[in-house]
Design a protein with these regions (language model features):
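Short connector loops at helix/strand junctions that flank enzyme active sites
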Residues: 43, 112-114, 129
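Non-catalytic linker/capping segments at the edges of enzyme domains
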Residues: 1-82, 102, 107, 123-124, ...
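A structural-propensity feature for long, helix-poor, extended segments
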Residues: 117-136
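Compact, glycine-rich, soluble single-domain proteins
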Residues: 79-81, 92-95
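Conserved short alpha-helical segments that host acidic/polar catalytic motifs at enzyme active sites
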Residues: 94-103, 107-118
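Active-site beta-strand/loop microenvironment that shapes enzyme catalytic pockets
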Residues: 89
Length: 196
């Protein structure tokens, strides 16, 4: 799809999310369009059902189909398989990073933190569907640095029961931090603080 088609799409299919993860979804990306989603198996989304904007705010609804043989059930935990709650938090960050790119942000995505996280349920192998609902509270493009920042409130549902909330989740896109020549040593092969 073209970059304009990407920015005007209101939903994304599984193959489109995987193509985005590998950097091949957009045929004519602008310079600096280095945002990616994690590739499977760490991609925690199967479909984006809705992505919309209303001024500096917006909304994202996405789903993940639960697979009995998912990698995390094999190791977390033996004789008591449950999807780690932190993966649900990461799914919210994944969605917010995608939202930044969809809004025209350039650079590579990084989770920046969140406020309170509350879990009141669990995801087991025989559950069927996780739904993520994110209310974007604010999207900002910082002209001086070229970074884009988004803040959202996330809720997780499993089979239509709410099981978690993630408050003040923050993600940003930052220019000049991509590491496309991995595993070679290069300017971005070592991490550290992003504000240097």
């Amino acid at each position: 799809m073209t970059y304009d088609e990407f920015k005007s799409s209101s939903r994304f299919a599984p193959e489109e999310l995987i193509a985005f993860a590998y950097g091949i979804l957009v045929d004519d990306p602008p310079a600096g369009f280095t945002a990616r989603l994690p590739a499977p198996p760490f991609l925690m989304l199967d479909r984006i059902l809705e992505i919309s904007v209303n001024g500096r705010q917006g909304r994202i609804i996405a789903v993940q189909e639960i697979r009995m043989d998912a990698w995390y059930f094999q190791c977390h935990m033996p004789a008591d398989p449950v999807q780690p709650g932190c993966l649900g938090v990461d799914a919210i960050w994944q969605l917010l990073g995608f939202y930044c790119a969809w809004r025209g942000g350039l650079g590579s995505g990084r989770a920046l933190g969140c406020g309170e996280v509350a879990f009141n349920g669990q995801i087991r192998p025989f559950n069927r569907l996780v739904r993520y609902e994110v209310d974007v509270r604010r999207f900002t493009h910082l002209k001086e640095s070229g970074a884009s920042i988004v803040i959202g409130e996330g809720r997780l549902f499993v089979d239509n029961e709410e099981i978690a909330e993630v408050h003040e989740a923050r993600t940003g896109l930052f220019k000049g931090i991509a590491y496309p020549d991995y595993p070679r040593r290069s300017a971005n092969s070592v991490g550290g603080r992003l504000d240097k």
